[in-house]
């Protein structure tokens, strides 16, 4: 599968081969769904915590005698029914993370890359560049040449270029990611995917096996 390579000014330069096994497979929406759920679960902190009737402050003495007062029977002021009492069945700190099978993860990445490249043409391949000044304005002018849809934009780098990342910090709805540190959720929800040549070559090597 061939794709046009553009200069940072938006001019056509040449073509690049996208491996069909990475960028042109039948999209598995099930694997994408499982991968996104896994990524979001792994991000959860899981620190929500409430006190049970055993942990809440208060006396365990019976407020009044069992019978003869006309009031409802109560055993303790820490009763979950009472204001200030313990919480019944409330959340406790827990780890929500879990492992996803490697084959499912790989299939999810290939599927979402194919979705971007083949199905709705979100992918634009751009020659390698850097932002020596680290200025936001310079990067914003480059991005403007390739934005096809309003919304989230992802730039894929072939390396960890700190100057490009610095330039993109103040641009709304923009994420700058290295090709080997991707998340399916970022690619699935992006409207525009701008990939540097080095990132495409890296993805071809990483997922072609």
UniProtKB/Swiss-Prot annotation:
GO terms for biological process: translation. GO terms for cellular component: ribonucleoprotein complex; ribosome. Keywords: Ribonucleoprotein, Ribosomal protein, RNA-binding, rRNA-binding. InterPro entries: Ribosomal_uL4, Ribosomal_uL4-like, Ribosomal_uL4_dom_sf. One of its GO terms (molecular function) is structural constituent of ribosome. It comes from the Bacteria. One of the primary rRNA binding proteins, this protein initially binds near the 5'-end of the 23S rRNA. It is important during the early stages of 50S assembly. It makes multiple contacts with different domains of the 23S rRNA in the assembled 50S subunit and ribosome. Part of the 50S ribosomal subunit. Belongs to the universal ribosomal protein uL4 family. This is Large ribosomal subunit protein uL4. The gene is rplD.
